[in-house]
Design a protein with these regions (language model features):
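Conserved phosphate- and dinucleotide-binding cores of soluble alpha/beta proteins
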Residues: 1, 124, 136, 140-193, ...
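Electropositive, gly/pro-rich neighborhoods at or near active sites that engage anionic ligands
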Residues: 1-101, 256-258, 271-289
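Conserved active-site and cofactor/substrate-binding residues in soluble primary-metabolism enzymes
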Residues: 3-4, 33, 37, 41, ...
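Glycine-rich phosphate/diphosphate-binding loops and the adjacent beta-loop-alpha structural elements
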Residues: 22-50, 134-141, 167-173, 204, ...
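Active-site gating loop/helix substructures
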Residues: 76-137
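Structural motif
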Residues: 130-132, 161-163, 198
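C-terminal functional extensions of proteins
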Residues: 175-289
Length: 289
């Protein structure tokens, strides 16, 4: 979805706070632009001006001084649809959580949307593939619905890590523990493909719990033993940010991932010297926080 591309660009950008705020801004009022994201419109304009989405993302990346590269899974306009456990079909990303039904499986239209060659190549060349965190059924799983992407993920020799959400998402993952999140990913891939799952084992405060209970959201239980029975190694960690909202602490999460890179000595596979040096510096900075 365009919003996911926008969020990835903003997250990787070496940006000023104003630029981040404007890229995430949604128009208000009664104008025809009301509800639309400036960032989405900007990316769409760049894609049209540059002759395609990949070229548009590349140009946007230059403007935002993005470190890394954001590559779409497919260039086709797709529509998500969910089959619920009661047999009903819900169409559209925004409509799926509104149904407040348990999801059996996800699909997309057109079902044969081709993967971008650059995305497939990036997956096959990767040392690590990281899934999540994010909306399980409408952000993470949609990538696996693109056949070429799913096949590349399964074929890839990269270490595959899933970062499980810390709270359930109303309308999508009601009542889910970490095990159900992992099960859903495996079901959509058609095979067990994960090597590691990072789960939160930090307790949510009573004040935070009360705030989320009003919205129908609950902490995701780590389910360590159940996941390990699938042949997946679980990394339980205190991951919650100290702020009011229950979110992953980005510094803690980065430290867990970088520590795993060191432990597996993945920097010897394909990560270049300057990347290795950057990671060492990053680790030192994270330990100070």
């Amino acid at each position: 979805p365009p919003g996911d591309l926008r969020n990835c660009l903003v997250a990787l950008a070496d940006r000023e706070p104003l630029m981040e705020r404007i890229m995430q801004y949604r128009f208000k009022g009664d104008s025809p632009l009301a509800g639309h994201s400036f960032g989405n419109l900007f990316i769409a304009a760049m894609a049209e001006a540059e002759g395609g989405m990949e070229a548009g993302l590349s140009a946007t990346s230059q403007i935002l001084n993005v470190r890394g590269k954001v590559v779409p899974s497919t260039l086709r306009d797709i529509r998500l649809k969910a089959e619920m456990t009661d047999g009903s079909i819900i169409n559209g990303e925004s409509e799926i959580p509104k149904a407040h039904k348990r999801i059996r499986t996800m699909a997309m239209e057109p079902a044969d949307a081709p993967a971008t060659a650059s995305a497939v190549q990036a997956i096959l060349n990767a040392d690590i593939l990281i899934f999540g965190p994010g909306s399980l059924y409408t952000s993470v799983i949609p990538n696996l619905l693109v056949t070429g992407i799913r096949d590349a993920v399964i074929k890839s020799e990269a270490v595959k890590i899933y970062i499980c959400n810390v709270m359930t998402q109303p309308g999508e993952t009601d009542g889910y523990g970490a095990f159900e999140h992992v099960q859903a990913l495996i079901q959509q891939a058609g095979t067990q493909f994960l090597d590691y799952v990072i789960v939160n084992d930090q307790r949510v405060t009573a004040a935070q719990l009360a705030q989320y209970n009003e919205k129908g959201s609950m902490p995701v239980t780590p389910d360590i033993k159940k996941i390990e029975r699938l042949g997946i190694q679980v990394i339980p960690t205190r991951l919650i940010s100290n702020k009011d909202l229950v979110r992953h602490n980005p510094q803690k999460l980065a430290q867990v991932i970088i520590s795993l890179v060191y432990r597996l000595r993945l920097f010897g596979k394909g990560i270049q010297f300057f990347d290795y040096f950057f990671m060492r510096q990053s680790m030192r900075e994270l330990k100070k926080k």
